[in-house]
Swiss-Prot record:
Pfam families: EF-hand_1, EF-hand_7. Ca(2+) 2 binds at residues 108, 110, 112, 114, 119. This is Calcium-binding protein 2. One of its GO terms (molecular function) is calcium channel regulator activity. InterPro entries: CaBP1/2/4/5, EF-hand-dom_pair, EF_Hand_1_Ca_BS, EF_hand_dom. GO terms for cellular component: cytoplasm; Golgi apparatus; perinuclear region of cytoplasm; plasma membrane. The keyword Lipoprotein applies. It is a lipid-anchor. The keyword Cell membrane applies. It comes from Bos taurus (Bovine). Required for sound encoding at inner hair cells (IHCs) synapses, likely via inhibition of the inactivation of voltage-gated calcium channel of type 1.3 (Cav1.3) in the IHCs. Required for the normal transfer of light signals through the retina. Coiled coil: none annotated.
Length: 163
């Protein structure tokens, strides 16, 4: 599979060349999920990574992609080949990873990488302009908090914003 140092021109197949800011957006999303910084993301993280770019893959699409991936991992060049056409086809109103990351940081006031119950309450008050009851905030958190740890991490935030 590819190495981004070898192929500096990023092309989306059968389409115009990706602009530098589009490459940067793909790079930011890729790096977000390349947690061990080995230049690859696993099939499991690929779906979450795609969602940060505003693309909602079905389980079937992810299974098909995983069958095409050798070794269960995707490097950045393969990621560009996969996501380039989707990025080029996206509509102007789709939210990119940079905007999602900025919004997440606004809510994560202590910068620990998670949105706590208190931070969520403050964010909802700022967004809605009214104070919600403890029960309402708990209900919202339960709906968003997929892993049940009482916090909203970036992936859970992306899923919430994509609904």
């Amino acid at each position: 599979m590819g190495n981004c140092a070898k192929r500096p021109r990023h092309r989306a197949p059968k389409d115009r060349e990706l602009r530098p800011e589009e490459i940067e957006e793909l790079q930011a999303a890729f790096q977000e999920f390349d947690r061990d910084r080995d230049g690859y993301i696993g099939y499991q993280e690929l779906g979450a990574c795609m969602r940060t770019l505003g693309y909602m893959p079905t389980e079937m699409e992810l299974i098909e992609i995983s069958q095409q991936i050798s070794g269960g991992k995707v490097d950045f060049e393969d990621f560009v080949e996969l996501m380039g056409p989707k990025l080029l086809a996206e509509t102007a109103d789709m939210i990119g990873v940079r905007e999602l990351r900025d919004a997440f940081r606004e809510f994560d006031t202590n910068g620990d990488g998670c949105i706590s119950l208190g931070e969520l309450r403050a964010a909802l008050k700022a967004l809605l302009g009214e104070r919600l009851s403890q029960r309402e905030v708990d209900e919202i958190l339960r709906d968003i908090d997929l892993n049940g740890d009482g916090l909203v991490d970036f992936e859970e935030f992306v899923r919430m914003m994509s609904r």
